[in-house]
């Protein structure tokens, strides 16, 4: 009887423990103190500093069963999971490690003993093949002369990836870090499975499967590509538990091992699925492992970094559950079966079972609200698609509005042989990021570098200019005593009217000046209790201790004040119009625009946007007083003051009230009365992620400018339509009606022309073994008319096979029609596929009708010429 996965895991650890190895527990899936890694993706991650000589352990040999996730960054297997036999988001890596202890000889001998000894895994020796790095003669000789593997089963692999050391047999965790040559062990499943040995053209087949990678850690790769010898040569090995389990349990797919069979049955039970071969069951069985263990290790679903990868995996699983027909939340119900099947490796998960289940349930419920609508939109877009690629804007809209990660959209498209324009998606994402970034040329880098022990007193609520004294100067993050003309620096004063960026409000700009100098302030930031004025000394020199006159850019500050006060009014209005679930998730207030992120699960309707706009403007017309009070935090909360997202508050807080309409904690600068704002207009509403919406708006002169711009556009349209603003709608309706009528007439003419063309074409059909064959390239015919023409020709010709093509804007459109009495011998889908392949495209359809597209118009004549021979062979 074959070993269970749990028994295999334990046997591996027991074997290496018997060889003097310390059994070390799996580390967290979240790498500690390693910014180069998104997730733990190999057994050696927790020993990286040991290999680098930066850390010492009280053992020189170790063995682990390490939990790993590969679903983001360099090692991203997500898109393949469920569609192949061996790709997973989560897997366990069995490993043994030597830290300056044994090296190549013992590492190879240990591996061979474990794999082939009757006491352990007892694999047939003749089924094992090995590879070595091309120049690693030492490893080659150990395998040949000491282990006794025939030369024909030892394969040297060189730099096969286009660069020095870029080889399947030279291992490196990333662009930098520990690396070295490796030897890999492969298992031959037998000649009944297609595939060739490693290094052969057929190596991607499933016959020869890598089961163990033994890395001889000799170097530390630097950022410039140089290889520095490690302090002590070491060994890092990795053997996928799921892969070796498949070998030992005599199955060819990881999803057929006992662990996955149990999980797949559990998935079928909670979703109501009956076909256990359905790939969606495999996807979900894999994904519950990564999701549950990531949450147990502290990762929460979110819209950035690790949290977003987790969210993507959860949503992919939920979508596959939807495909299986799951009628209610199901994913969280798999945590219990997972704990049971993991055995001792699931103890950490068991302790956190309740929390993991709750997080999964909440996330699934949140996504379920938009999944159906998003899938309906995607189905609609795919139905309209004429080519084989979904545009990036649509993919982004699915992400932005419905929370569809692009790989989920790609999954749906993949099932229909459609690609996704991921470059277009990234362009749309980057545009959103661009809008989200505050264009500050200073500040961010300085924040990380500067440490100021002194404090600055902010007096900008009541003053826009005052005298202060320089208490510190920083250039490139380092404290200096003086600066000269042309130098960029951070100037710290004892007191200042400049507002430092905080609570979403940008820092002030302005000037620090004296008798012999002028310092242009481009930004203002906080450094602990100090306020730093960031900019450039335009003239003269400045030193610590100098007196300065600090002048804030008054006009800019005034515009910021209006925008900030309007943000408070809008927040309160959103809660009235949409509901009290609205809470602030972030904001940006500068002199040009205000941006406000808030919790809401769907795009705002036009009437909701108008209602918010009207409500804010009503408060502006009320000319409410804007008042501030300093009070205890608890008293402010009791008063109902709303706190700002992401801010920390002292025990004494500043409470800002706008009449009876809005009360918030706020340290920003504001107008005196709401009437000062003048006018408020919303210019955009969009999503930043599922459950978070973003509004951008303008006030005062900026709002008036948008009114003028709208009026100018209306005037231009009215002029073009020879009307005026009073009858513009009627004019547009008239033009649209005339356009519809002309389009209808044009369509009728096209159909008449197509019918005439069909009549002319029918005479060109030739007889092939009793069947009429018609192949023709048409010019001036719209692709969508081809189907009508094929239907007409089939009616005219009887037993027939038809292939029509047309080229428009460099793209080939193809259609094939086969009369039903011929489809047992010739299928339209196969025929069109043969032609499409020759013109750089693909397609498909029913046996009697199929369509395709292509990009190589020059190849079309030859492709059409090949139809007669292909059809003749089929009709023989």
From Swiss-Prot:
Binds 1 zinc ion per subunit. Its main location: cytoplasm. Zn(2+) binds at residues 564, 568, 666, 670. GO terms for biological process: alanyl-tRNA aminoacylation; negative regulation of DNA-templated transcription. Its cofactor is Zn(2+). It catalyses: tRNA(Ala) + L-alanine + ATP = L-alanyl-tRNA(Ala) + AMP + diphosphate. SUPFAM superfamilies: Class II aaRS and biotin synthetases, Putative anticodon-binding domain of alanyl-tRNA synthetase (AlaRS), ThrRS/AlaRS common domain, Translation proteins. It is an enzyme of class 6 (ligase). PANTHER family: ALANINE--TRNA LIGASE, CYTOPLASMIC, ALANYL-TRNA SYNTHETASE. Consists of three domains; the N-terminal catalytic domain, the editing domain and the C-terminal C-Ala domain. The editing domain removes incorrectly charged amino acids, while the C-Ala domain, along with tRNA(Ala), serves as a bridge to cooperatively bring together the editing and aminoacylation centers thus stimulating deacylation of misacylated tRNAs. Catalyzes the attachment of alanine to tRNA(Ala) in a two-step reaction: alanine is first activated by ATP to form Ala-AMP and then transferred to the acceptor end of tRNA(Ala). Also edits incorrectly charged Ser-tRNA(Ala) and Gly-tRNA(Ala) via its editing domain. This is Alanine--tRNA ligase.
């Amino acid at each position: 009887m074959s070993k269970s996965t749990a028994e295999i895991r334990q046997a591996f650890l027991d074997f290496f423990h018997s060889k003097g190895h310390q059994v070390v527990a799996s580390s967290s899936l979240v790498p500690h103190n390693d910014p180069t890694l998104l997730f733990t993706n190999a057994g050696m991650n927790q020993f990286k500093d040991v290999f680098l000589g930066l850390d010492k352990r009280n053992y020189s040999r170790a063995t682990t069963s390490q939990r790993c996730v590969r679903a983001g960054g360099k090692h991203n297997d997500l898109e393949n999971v469920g569609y192949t036999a061996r790709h997973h988001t989560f897997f366990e890596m069995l490993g043994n490690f030597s830290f300056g202890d044994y090296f190549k000889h013992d590492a190879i001998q240990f591996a061979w003993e474990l794999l082939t000894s009757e006491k352990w895994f007892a694999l047939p020796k003749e089924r094992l093949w090995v590879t070595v790095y091309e120049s690693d003669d030492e490893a080659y000789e150990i395998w040949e002369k000491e282990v006794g593997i025939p030369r024909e089963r030892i394969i040297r692999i060189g730099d096969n990836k286009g660069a020095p050391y870029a080889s399947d047999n030279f291992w490196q965790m990333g662009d930098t870090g520990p690396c070295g040559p490796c030897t890999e062990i492969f298992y031959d499943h037998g000649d009944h499975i297609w595939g060739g040995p490693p290094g052969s053209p057929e190596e991607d087949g499933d016959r020869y499967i890598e089961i163990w990678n033994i890395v001889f850690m000799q170097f530390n790769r630097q950022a410039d590509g140089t290889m520095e010898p490690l302090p002590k040569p070491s060994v890092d090995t990795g053997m996928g538990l799921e892969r070796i389990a498949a070998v030992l349990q005599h199955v060819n797919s990881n999803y057929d091992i006992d662990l996955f069979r149990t999980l797949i049955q559990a998935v079928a039970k909670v979703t109501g699925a009956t076909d256990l071969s359905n790939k969606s069951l495999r996807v979900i069985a894999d994904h519950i492992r990564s999701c549950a263990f990531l949450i147990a290790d502290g990762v929460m679903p979110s819209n950035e970094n690790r949290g977003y990868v987790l969210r993507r995996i959860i949503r992919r699983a939920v979508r596959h559950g939807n495909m299986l027909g799951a009628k209610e939340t199901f994913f969280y119900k798999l945590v219990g079966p997972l704990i049971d099947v993991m055995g001792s490796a699931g103890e950490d998960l068991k302790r956190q079972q309740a929390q993991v289940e709750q997080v999964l349930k909440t996330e699934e419920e949140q996504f379920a609200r938009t999944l159906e609508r998003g899938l309906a939109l995607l189905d609609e877009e795919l139905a309209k698609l004429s080519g084989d690629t979904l545009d990036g804007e649509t993919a982004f809209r699915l992400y932005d509005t419905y929370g569809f990660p692009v790989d989920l959209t790609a999954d749906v498209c993949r099932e229909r042989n459609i690609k996704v324009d991921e470059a277009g998606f990234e362009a749309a994402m980057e545009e959103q990021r661009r809008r989200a970034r505050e264009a500050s040329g200073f500040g961010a880098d300085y924040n990380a570098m500067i440490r100021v022990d002194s404090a600055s007193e902010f007096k900008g609520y009541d003053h826009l200019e005052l005298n202060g004294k320089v208490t510190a100067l920083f250039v490139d993050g380092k404290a200096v005593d003086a600066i000269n003309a042309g130098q960029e620096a951070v100037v710290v004063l004892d007191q200042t009217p400049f507002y430092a960026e905080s609570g979403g409000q940008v820092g002030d700009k302005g000037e620090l000046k004296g008798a012999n100098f002028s310092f242009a302030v481009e930004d203002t930031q906080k450094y602990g209790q100090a306020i730093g004025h960031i900019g450039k000394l335009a003239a003269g020199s400045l030193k610590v201790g100098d007196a300065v006159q600090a002048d804030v850019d008054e006009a800019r500050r005034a515009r910021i004040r209006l925008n900030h006060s309007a943000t408070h009014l809008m927040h309160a209005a959103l809660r009235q119009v949409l509901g009290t679930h609205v809470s602030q998730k972030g904001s940006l207030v500068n002199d040009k625009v205000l941006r406000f992120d808030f919790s809401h699960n769907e795009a705002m309707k036009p009437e909701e946007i108008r209602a918010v706009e009207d409500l804010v403007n009503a408060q502006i017309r009320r000319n409410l007083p804007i008042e501030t009070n300093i009070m205890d935090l608890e008293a402010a909360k009791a008063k109902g003051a709303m706190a700002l997202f992401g801010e920390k508050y002292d025990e004494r807080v500043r409470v800002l009230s706008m009449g009876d309409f809005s009360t918030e904690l706020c340290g920003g600068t504001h107008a005196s009365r709401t009437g000062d704002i003048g006018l408020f207009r919303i210019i955009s509403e969009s999503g930043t992620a599922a459950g978070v919406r973003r509004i951008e708006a303008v006030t005062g002169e900026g709002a008036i400018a948008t009114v003028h711009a709208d009026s100018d556009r209306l005037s231009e349209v009215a002029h073009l339509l020879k009307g005026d603003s009073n009858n513009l709608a009627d004019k547009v309706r008239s033009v649209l009606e005339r356009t519809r009528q002309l389009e209808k007439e044009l369509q009728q003419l096209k159909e008449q022309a197509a019918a005439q063309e069909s009549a002319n074409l029918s005479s060109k059909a030739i007889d092939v073994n009793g069947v009429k064959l018609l192949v023709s390239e048409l010019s001036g015919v719209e692709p969508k008319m081809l189907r009508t023409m094929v239907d007409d020709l089939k009616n005219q010709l009887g037993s027939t096979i038809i292939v029509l093509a047309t080229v428009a804007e460099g793209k080939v459109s193809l259609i094939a029609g086969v009369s039903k009495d011929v489809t047992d011998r010739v299928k339209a889908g196969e025929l069109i596929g043969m032609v499409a392949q020759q013109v750089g495209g693909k397609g498909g359809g029913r046996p009697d009708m199929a369509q395709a597209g292509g990009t190589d118009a020059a190849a079309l004549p030859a492709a059409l010429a090949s139809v007669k021979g292909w059809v003749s062979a089929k009709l023989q």
